[in-house]
Amino acid sequence: MQNRIEIAEATLKEDRLILTTKSEEQIQKAKASGQMLVDSDHFAFVYILENEESFSYLILGEDTWAPLKEAMTLDIPVYLAAEGHSLELIQLHQELHYLIDNIKDNANYGDMEEKVKSTFL
């Protein structure tokens, strides 16, 4: 995947989860798409960001899963942030629930199925 955005830190606040990245340029003009994919080879969920010319892929690896689960449990929004810019990741909870339901008991996802079950279910 080109235009990958990696998360440097996940910080749970009272009213939101903040995913911090060092890729400031990539999020300045980005818009949240409300759509996600699965990268089962790298054990990651992928949130799609749109800009005028292309897409960027926010990689939500295993190290972000526990904070994401907590944000889902608390029903608080998730934001992507970098150097004074922030962007709410709309529809993230709904998309993540949908993907988790599809992964559960589906051997097509290989080892990711067990990892998802142990964290989210």
Curated annotation (Swiss-Prot):
InterPro entries: UPF0738 (IPR020908). It holds the Pfam family UPF0738. It comes from the Bacteria. Belongs to the UPF0738 family. This is UPF0738 protein BPUM_1088.
